Amino acid sequence: MSGRSVRAETRSRAKDDIKKVMAAIERVRRWEKKWVTVGDTSLRIFKWVPVTETKQIYKPKGAGPAVRELKGFPTDVVLENARSVLLDFQDDNSNQSFLSDAYQSNTKVDSSSNSSPQHVSEAVSPSHPPYYRTEDSQPPTLGQESMEAEREASTTSSEVTDEPPTLIKEDVLSLSTQEEEEAIGAPPLKRVCTEHNSTVS
């Protein structure tokens, strides 16, 4: 085969795969960030994956437990097709950004078409604790990182003053009491002496 025909075939296969993924994304409306193992390796990445309880999403509101169908197809067949397509693309590193971008564009479309912003925020927000703790084994999500950065910025801006710290009488007294404790035999406290450093160097 010539190089052009191979490239054309690859391009058409890629387009077909993209169409399958886009169709699956349209069916799956709830996504969450999870740690996913890549292929047979021990490499794990943190990426958007569809929520596994998809049968609840496809349940029609008016229908009972009788036969459920979606556009003429049984729901189970549609779910299996969507799962198989998504599983094909979950292990590829190259598709991580594609799925993420596709999800972000879907949320923009959903938020512009929905009249209730509360429903959109419920579907988009991951089910993580509101704050990242150091004992957690997973890193925070993007929203949590920005909240922490804003919180830290607000605390540092409130602590920062325009004037440099000044030495007041209480500080002088505390220095003299420290010297007395050293003379008594108490363990010395660590302090920084700027005058001593400037004379040595």
Curated annotation (Swiss-Prot):
Residues 104-201 are annotated as: Disordered. InterPro entries: BCL7. Pfam families: BCL_N (PF04714). Belongs to the BCL7 family. PANTHER family: B-CELL CLL_LYMPHOMA 7 PROTEIN FAMILY MEMBER B (PTHR12767:SF5), BCL7 RELATED (PTHR12767). This is B-cell CLL/lymphoma 7 protein family member B-B. It comes from Danio rerio.
